[in-house]
């Protein structure tokens, strides 16, 4: 039994049917319906608006190409979020490889950062977490997913999700300790 009202399910089914039939208006409505929430998820993982927008566009290409494979074991929104998160993680890994290559050629000088704004400091500290830690932290602490759901989304064990969250929190505490002194 579903927790969603029948009207909502039939609207989602109608939208899905239109997208499967390559109806451009249905595809546009699907994109419009989910773009803001999915952009926020990608942005939290990537920490860069341009990269998040690129990842979102690539994810929606993946979504439209893979819609026939949607088995309706979850809501359409949950399935879309999994694809967006995975695409954002792929983008993050690609960018990190490019960044390492770039730093080898042009090392940047060390820059001291002195943020007085807690929100900015937290955003920066989250952005500096290793990719896996950041993804798990954002999905559990910001998005509110359970470890089982995160494990499924990221293709990791539930214990790994819990461990990565623990280590992410420890790193954040160390990075932000100066705010509480």
Segments predicted by a language model, with ranges:
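Helix-turn-helix DNA-binding motif, specifically the short coil turn and the N-cap/start of the second
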Residues: 48, 146, 155-160
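Amphipathic, Lys/Arg- and hydrophobic-enriched alpha-helical face
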Residues: 31-49, 66, 126, 177-178
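A short, charge-rich alpha-helical start-of-domain segment used by transcription regulators
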Residues: 16-40
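Short, Lys/Arg-enriched C-terminal cap helix and immediately downstream tail that follows
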Residues: 71, 93, 129, 134, ...
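Sigma70-family region 2
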Residues: 20-21, 44-47, 57-75, 94-96
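A short pre-motif secondary-structure segment
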Residues: 136-140
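Short, basic/polar amphipathic helix motif occurring as a linker/hinge flanking DNA-binding modules
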Residues: 81, 91-113, 117
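Structural recognition of an alpha-helix C-terminal capping motif at a helix-to-coil junction
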Residues: 40, 54-61, 74-86
């Amino acid at each position: 039994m579903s927790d969603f009202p029948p009207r909502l399910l039939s609207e989602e089914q109608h939208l899905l049917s239109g997208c499967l039939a390559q109806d451009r208006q249905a595809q546009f409505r699907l994109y419009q319906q989910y773009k803001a929430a999915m952009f926020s998820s990608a942005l939290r993982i990537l920490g860069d608006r341009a990269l998040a927008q690129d990842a979102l566009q690539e994810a929606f290409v993946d979504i439209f190409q893979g819609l026939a494979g949607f088995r309706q074991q979850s809501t359409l929104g949950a399935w879309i979020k999994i694809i967006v998160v995975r695409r954002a993680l792929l983008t993050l890994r690609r960018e990190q490889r490019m960044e390492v290559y770039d730093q080898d050629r042009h090392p940047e000088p060390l820059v001291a950062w002195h943020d007085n704004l807690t929100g900015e400091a937290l955003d920066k500290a989250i952005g500096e977490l290793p990719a896996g830690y950041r993804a798990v932290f954002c999905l559990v602490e910001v998005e509110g997913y359970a470890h089982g759901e995160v494990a499924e989304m990221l293709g990791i064990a539930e214990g790994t999700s819990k461990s990565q969250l623990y280590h992410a929190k420890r790193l954040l505490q160390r990075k932000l300790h100066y705010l509480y002194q």
